[in-house]
Protein backbone atom coordinates (compact mmCIF):
# COMPACT_ATOMS: atom_id res chain seq x y z
CA UNK A 1 0.00 0.00 0.00
CA UNK A 2 1.32 3.49 -0.86
CA UNK A 3 0.75 6.63 1.17
CA UNK A 4 -1.97 8.01 -1.12
CA UNK A 5 -4.04 4.86 -0.67
CA UNK A 6 -3.36 4.94 3.07
CA UNK A 7 -4.49 8.57 3.31
CA UNK A 8 -7.75 7.68 1.60
CA UNK A 9 -8.32 4.94 4.18
CA UNK A 10 -7.32 6.97 7.21
CA UNK A 11 -9.43 10.06 6.42
CA UNK A 12 -12.43 7.72 6.22
CA UNK A 13 -11.62 6.41 9.73
CA UNK A 14 -10.53 3.01 8.40
CA UNK A 15 -7.66 1.12 10.04
CA UNK A 16 -4.58 -0.28 8.29
CA UNK A 17 -3.29 -3.80 8.74
CA UNK A 18 0.19 -4.40 10.15
CA UNK A 19 1.56 -5.15 6.67
CA UNK A 20 -0.11 -2.08 5.16
CA UNK A 21 1.38 0.09 7.89
CA UNK A 22 4.80 -1.41 7.20
CA UNK A 23 4.48 -0.46 3.52
CA UNK A 24 3.55 3.14 4.32
CA UNK A 25 6.23 3.54 7.00
CA UNK A 26 8.88 2.19 4.65
CA UNK A 27 7.84 4.80 2.05
CA UNK A 28 8.00 7.57 4.66
CA UNK A 29 11.32 6.48 6.19
CA UNK A 30 13.08 6.05 2.85
CA UNK A 31 12.25 9.54 1.60
CA UNK A 32 9.59 8.63 -0.96
CA UNK A 33 6.85 10.87 0.49
CA UNK A 34 6.40 14.64 0.44
CA UNK A 35 6.26 16.57 3.71
CA UNK A 36 2.60 17.41 3.01
CA UNK A 37 1.78 13.71 2.67
CA UNK A 38 3.64 12.86 5.88
CA UNK A 39 1.93 15.64 7.84
CA UNK A 40 -1.51 14.67 6.53
CA UNK A 41 -0.92 11.01 7.35
CA UNK A 42 0.25 11.73 10.90
CA UNK A 43 -2.75 13.97 11.61
CA UNK A 44 -5.15 11.48 10.06
CA UNK A 45 -3.72 8.72 12.23
CA UNK A 46 -4.00 10.85 15.35
CA UNK A 47 -7.62 11.79 14.64
CA UNK A 48 -8.53 8.16 13.93
CA UNK A 49 -6.39 6.81 16.82
CA UNK A 50 -3.60 4.35 16.12
CA UNK A 51 -4.38 0.65 16.55
CA UNK A 52 -2.08 -2.00 18.01
CA UNK A 53 -1.64 -3.49 14.51
CA UNK A 54 -0.59 -0.12 13.12
CA UNK A 55 1.89 0.59 15.92
CA UNK A 56 3.41 -2.89 15.51
CA UNK A 57 3.89 -2.22 11.80
CA UNK A 58 5.47 1.19 12.40
CA UNK A 59 7.81 -0.07 15.13
CA UNK A 60 8.96 -3.04 13.07
CA UNK A 61 10.04 -0.78 10.19
CA UNK A 62 11.87 1.63 12.50
CA UNK A 63 13.70 -1.30 14.10
CA UNK A 64 14.54 -2.72 10.67
CA UNK A 65 16.07 0.58 9.48
CA UNK A 66 17.94 1.40 12.73
CA UNK A 67 21.72 1.25 13.10
CA UNK A 68 21.73 -1.62 15.58
CA UNK A 69 23.91 -2.20 18.63
CA UNK A 70 24.98 -5.85 18.79
CA UNK A 71 25.40 -7.11 22.36
CA UNK A 72 26.84 -10.45 23.51
CA UNK A 73 23.55 -11.24 25.23
CA UNK A 74 20.20 -9.55 25.86
CA UNK A 75 19.46 -11.61 28.98
CA UNK A 76 18.77 -9.20 31.82
CA UNK A 77 19.74 -6.12 29.77
CA UNK A 78 17.25 -3.34 30.53
CA UNK A 79 16.19 0.09 29.28
CA UNK A 80 14.23 2.70 31.22
CA UNK A 81 12.69 5.35 29.01
CA UNK A 82 9.73 7.69 28.68
CA UNK A 83 7.79 9.26 25.85
CA UNK A 84 8.14 12.68 27.46
CA UNK A 85 5.42 15.20 26.87
CA UNK A 86 4.01 15.07 30.40
CA UNK A 87 4.60 18.81 30.86
CA UNK A 88 5.96 18.44 34.40
CA UNK A 89 9.62 19.34 33.68
CA UNK A 90 10.79 17.02 36.46
CA UNK A 91 14.54 16.29 36.49
CA UNK A 92 15.77 13.38 34.34
CA UNK A 93 14.50 10.56 36.54
CA UNK A 94 14.92 7.69 34.08
CA UNK A 95 18.47 8.69 33.14
CA UNK A 96 19.50 9.07 36.78
CA UNK A 97 17.84 5.74 37.52
CA UNK A 98 19.92 4.06 34.81
CA UNK A 99 23.10 4.65 36.82
CA UNK A 100 21.53 3.20 39.97
CA UNK A 101 20.41 0.15 37.99
CA UNK A 102 23.96 -0.30 36.72
CA UNK A 103 25.37 0.19 40.22
CA UNK A 104 23.09 -2.64 41.37
CA UNK A 105 24.84 -4.98 38.94
CA UNK A 106 22.30 -4.94 36.12
CA UNK A 107 23.31 -4.09 32.52
CA UNK A 108 21.68 -0.98 31.01
CA UNK A 109 21.26 -0.17 27.30
CA UNK A 110 19.72 3.32 27.58
CA UNK A 111 18.00 4.84 24.56
CA UNK A 112 17.14 8.53 24.47
CA UNK A 113 17.19 11.88 22.75
CA UNK A 114 17.26 15.61 23.30
CA UNK A 115 14.28 17.37 24.84
CA UNK A 116 11.41 18.16 22.50
CA UNK A 117 8.86 19.81 24.80
CA UNK A 118 10.64 19.58 28.16
CA UNK A 119 13.62 21.42 29.63
CA UNK A 120 16.13 18.56 29.64
CA UNK A 121 16.20 15.36 27.60
CA UNK A 122 18.43 12.42 28.48
CA UNK A 123 20.94 13.41 25.79
CA UNK A 124 21.03 17.01 27.08
CA UNK A 125 21.69 15.82 30.63
CA UNK A 126 24.45 13.37 29.70
CA UNK A 127 26.14 15.95 27.51
CA UNK A 128 26.12 18.36 30.48
CA UNK A 129 27.71 15.58 32.56
CA UNK A 130 30.58 15.23 30.07
CA UNK A 131 29.36 12.08 28.32
CA UNK A 132 30.26 11.98 24.61
CA UNK A 133 27.12 11.15 22.63
CA UNK A 134 28.16 10.58 19.03
CA UNK A 135 29.29 6.99 19.37
CA UNK A 136 29.22 4.29 16.72
CA UNK A 137 27.12 1.18 17.46
CA UNK A 138 30.35 -0.76 18.13
CA UNK A 139 31.52 1.90 20.61
CA UNK A 140 28.17 1.82 22.43
CA UNK A 141 28.46 -1.97 22.73
CA UNK A 142 31.95 -1.56 24.20
CA UNK A 143 30.59 0.93 26.78
CA UNK A 144 27.86 -1.48 27.80
CA UNK A 145 30.32 -4.37 28.01
CA UNK A 146 32.99 -2.46 29.96
CA UNK A 147 31.05 0.04 32.12
CA UNK A 148 27.77 -1.86 32.46
CA UNK A 149 25.83 1.02 30.92
CA UNK A 150 25.75 2.70 27.52
CA UNK A 151 23.71 5.43 25.88
CA UNK A 152 22.25 5.19 22.39
CA UNK A 153 21.57 8.69 21.05
CA UNK A 154 18.35 8.24 19.05
CA UNK A 155 19.25 10.57 16.20
CA UNK A 156 22.51 8.66 15.63
CA UNK A 157 20.73 5.31 15.33
CA UNK A 158 17.52 6.33 13.55
CA UNK A 159 18.82 8.46 10.67
CA UNK A 160 15.70 7.64 8.61
CA UNK A 161 13.74 9.82 11.05
CA UNK A 162 15.15 12.89 9.28
CA UNK A 163 12.34 12.57 6.73
CA UNK A 164 9.71 13.23 9.41
CA UNK A 165 11.49 16.04 11.26
CA UNK A 166 10.01 18.92 9.23
CA UNK A 167 6.36 17.83 9.32
CA UNK A 168 6.54 16.94 13.02
CA UNK A 169 8.10 20.29 13.88
CA UNK A 170 5.55 22.24 11.83
CA UNK A 171 2.58 20.32 13.25
CA UNK A 172 3.76 20.95 16.81
CA UNK A 173 1.46 18.20 18.12
CA UNK A 174 2.01 14.73 19.50
CA UNK A 175 1.90 12.15 16.73
CA UNK A 176 2.52 8.44 16.24
CA UNK A 177 6.26 9.11 16.40
CA UNK A 178 6.08 10.23 20.04
CA UNK A 179 5.17 6.64 20.90
CA UNK A 180 7.78 4.97 18.71
CA UNK A 181 11.04 6.13 20.34
CA UNK A 182 10.71 4.05 23.54
CA UNK A 183 9.70 1.00 21.47
CA UNK A 184 12.68 1.11 19.09
CA UNK A 185 15.74 0.53 21.29
CA UNK A 186 18.64 -0.11 18.84
CA UNK A 187 20.04 -2.90 21.02
CA UNK A 188 16.73 -4.77 20.85
CA UNK A 189 16.30 -5.02 24.63
CA UNK A 190 13.48 -7.28 25.81
CA UNK A 191 13.28 -5.89 29.36
CA UNK A 192 12.05 -2.31 29.87
CA UNK A 193 10.26 0.27 31.93
CA UNK A 194 8.38 2.52 29.48
CA UNK A 195 6.74 5.70 30.75
CA UNK A 196 3.90 7.15 28.66
CA UNK A 197 2.11 10.51 28.59
CA UNK A 198 -1.40 9.00 28.72
CA UNK A 199 -2.71 6.13 30.84
CA UNK A 200 -4.81 4.92 27.89
CA UNK A 201 -1.58 3.94 26.11
CA UNK A 202 -0.31 1.60 28.83
CA UNK A 203 -2.04 -1.62 27.85
CA UNK A 204 -1.86 -1.09 24.05
CA UNK A 205 1.90 -0.48 24.14
CA UNK A 206 2.41 -3.50 26.40
CA UNK A 207 0.46 -5.54 23.82
CA UNK A 208 2.64 -4.10 21.03
CA UNK A 209 5.82 -5.14 22.87
CA UNK A 210 4.38 -8.60 23.52
CA UNK A 211 3.85 -9.07 19.78
CA UNK A 212 7.36 -7.82 19.06
CA UNK A 213 9.04 -10.34 21.37
CA UNK A 214 9.63 -8.46 24.64
CA UNK A 215 9.89 -10.61 27.78
CA UNK A 216 9.26 -8.42 30.83
CA UNK A 217 8.07 -4.82 30.51
CA UNK A 218 6.29 -2.30 32.73
CA UNK A 219 4.41 0.44 30.85
CA UNK A 220 3.52 3.16 33.34
CA UNK A 221 1.69 6.46 33.84
CA UNK A 222 1.10 8.13 37.19
CA UNK A 223 -2.19 9.56 38.42
CA UNK A 224 -0.57 13.00 38.64
CA UNK A 225 0.38 12.84 34.96
CA UNK A 226 4.02 11.71 34.90
CA UNK A 227 5.54 9.31 32.39
CA UNK A 228 7.20 7.42 35.26
CA UNK A 229 6.52 6.16 38.78
CA UNK A 230 5.50 9.13 40.91
CA UNK A 231 6.48 9.88 44.48
CA UNK A 232 3.29 11.90 44.98
CA UNK A 233 0.51 9.72 43.58
CA UNK A 234 -0.43 6.17 42.61
CA UNK A 235 1.05 4.88 39.34
CA UNK A 236 -0.84 2.75 36.83
CA UNK A 237 1.12 -0.22 35.46
CA UNK A 238 0.51 -2.51 32.50
CA UNK A 239 2.96 -5.36 33.09
CA UNK A 240 4.01 -7.79 30.37
CA UNK A 241 5.38 -10.97 31.92
CA UNK A 242 5.26 -14.64 30.93
CA UNK A 243 3.44 -13.75 27.72
CA UNK A 244 0.54 -12.02 29.48
CA UNK A 245 -0.38 -8.40 30.25
CA UNK A 246 -1.80 -7.53 33.67
CA UNK A 247 -2.84 -4.11 34.97
CA UNK A 248 -2.67 -2.66 38.48
CA UNK A 249 -2.04 0.46 40.55
CA UNK A 250 0.99 0.95 42.81
CA UNK A 251 1.37 3.39 45.72
CA UNK A 252 4.86 4.45 46.87
CA UNK A 253 3.98 2.98 50.30
CA UNK A 254 3.41 -0.43 48.69
CA UNK A 255 7.12 -0.38 47.83
CA UNK A 256 8.40 0.90 51.16
CA UNK A 257 8.64 4.57 50.17
CA UNK A 258 6.76 7.46 51.78
CA UNK A 259 4.56 9.55 49.47
CA UNK A 260 5.55 13.21 49.26
CA UNK A 261 5.01 16.18 46.98
CA UNK A 262 7.10 16.78 43.87
CA UNK A 263 7.88 20.32 45.01
CA UNK A 264 11.49 21.19 44.23
CA UNK A 265 11.97 18.45 41.61
CA UNK A 266 11.18 20.55 38.52
CA UNK A 267 14.16 21.95 36.60
CA UNK A 268 14.74 24.68 34.04
CA UNK A 269 17.85 23.32 32.31
CA UNK A 270 20.10 20.28 31.87
CA UNK A 271 22.65 21.89 34.19
CA UNK A 272 20.07 22.24 36.96
CA UNK A 273 18.92 18.65 36.42
CA UNK A 274 22.53 17.43 36.64
CA UNK A 275 23.12 19.38 39.86
CA UNK A 276 20.06 17.81 41.47
CA UNK A 277 21.02 14.31 40.29
CA UNK A 278 24.59 14.62 41.62
CA UNK A 279 23.10 15.76 44.93
CA UNK A 280 20.69 12.78 44.95
CA UNK A 281 23.40 10.25 44.06
CA UNK A 282 25.90 11.63 46.57
CA UNK A 283 26.49 10.45 50.12
CA UNK A 284 25.45 13.73 51.75
CA UNK A 285 22.18 15.03 50.37
CA UNK A 286 20.18 18.22 50.72
CA UNK A 287 16.49 17.88 51.61
CA UNK A 288 15.49 18.17 47.93
CA UNK A 289 18.32 15.82 46.97
CA UNK A 290 16.93 13.21 49.38
CA UNK A 291 13.48 13.57 47.79
CA UNK A 292 15.01 13.18 44.32
CA UNK A 293 16.85 10.08 45.55
CA UNK A 294 13.53 8.51 46.63
CA UNK A 295 12.06 9.21 43.18
CA UNK A 296 15.11 7.64 41.52
CA UNK A 297 15.00 4.57 43.77
CA UNK A 298 11.31 4.03 42.96
CA UNK A 299 11.97 3.98 39.21
CA UNK A 300 15.31 2.15 39.31
CA UNK A 301 13.67 -0.52 41.46
CA UNK A 302 10.97 -1.02 38.85
CA UNK A 303 13.63 -1.52 36.18
CA UNK A 304 15.52 -4.06 38.31
CA UNK A 305 12.26 -5.98 38.57
CA UNK A 306 11.62 -5.70 34.79
CA UNK A 307 15.16 -7.02 34.21
CA UNK A 308 14.35 -10.02 36.45
CA UNK A 309 17.18 -8.87 38.71
CA UNK A 310 14.56 -8.80 41.49
CA UNK A 311 11.56 -11.05 42.08
CA UNK A 312 9.14 -8.22 42.93
CA UNK A 313 8.80 -4.46 42.64
CA UNK A 314 9.35 -4.12 46.38
CA UNK A 315 12.56 -6.17 46.26
CA UNK A 316 13.74 -4.12 43.27
CA UNK A 317 13.22 -0.88 45.18
CA UNK A 318 15.16 -2.25 48.16
CA UNK A 319 18.07 -3.24 45.88
CA UNK A 320 17.99 0.19 44.21
CA UNK A 321 18.03 1.90 47.63
CA UNK A 322 21.14 -0.04 48.65
CA UNK A 323 22.88 0.64 45.32
CA UNK A 324 22.19 4.39 45.44
CA UNK A 325 23.44 4.79 48.98
CA UNK A 326 26.80 3.13 48.25
CA UNK A 327 27.72 6.11 46.05
CA UNK A 328 28.54 3.72 43.21
CA UNK A 329 25.84 5.20 40.94
CA UNK A 330 27.54 8.59 40.99
CA UNK A 331 30.85 6.89 40.19
CA UNK A 332 29.17 5.13 37.24
CA UNK A 333 28.15 8.51 35.80
CA UNK A 334 31.74 9.76 35.98
CA UNK A 335 33.05 6.45 34.62
CA UNK A 336 30.81 6.64 31.56
CA UNK A 337 32.02 10.18 30.87
CA UNK A 338 35.67 9.13 31.09
CA UNK A 339 35.13 6.01 28.96
CA UNK A 340 33.36 7.92 26.17
CA UNK A 341 36.02 10.66 26.19
CA UNK A 342 38.45 8.13 24.71
CA UNK A 343 36.05 7.53 21.81
CA UNK A 344 35.69 11.28 21.30
CA UNK A 345 39.45 11.53 20.78
CA UNK A 346 39.33 8.61 18.32
CA UNK A 347 36.35 9.95 16.36
CA UNK A 348 37.60 13.53 16.16
CA UNK A 349 41.25 12.73 15.44
Curated annotation (Swiss-Prot):
Binding, anthranilate 2: 168
Signal peptide: none
GO CC terms, sorted: cytosol
EC number: 2.4.2.18
Gene3D superfamilies: Nucleoside phosphorylase/phosphoribosyltransferase catalytic domain, Transferase, Pyrimidine Nucleoside Phosphorylase, Chain C
Pathway involvement of the protein, from the record: Amino-acid biosynthesis; L-tryptophan biosynthesis; L-tryptophan from chorismate: step 2/5
The protein's assembly and partners: Homodimer.
Protein name according to UniProt: Anthranilate phosphoribosyltransferase
Native source organism of the sequence: Pseudomonas syringae pv. tomato (strain ATCC BAA-871 / DC3000)
Classification of source organism: Bacteria, Pseudomonadati, Pseudomonadota, Gammaproteobacteria, Pseudomonadales
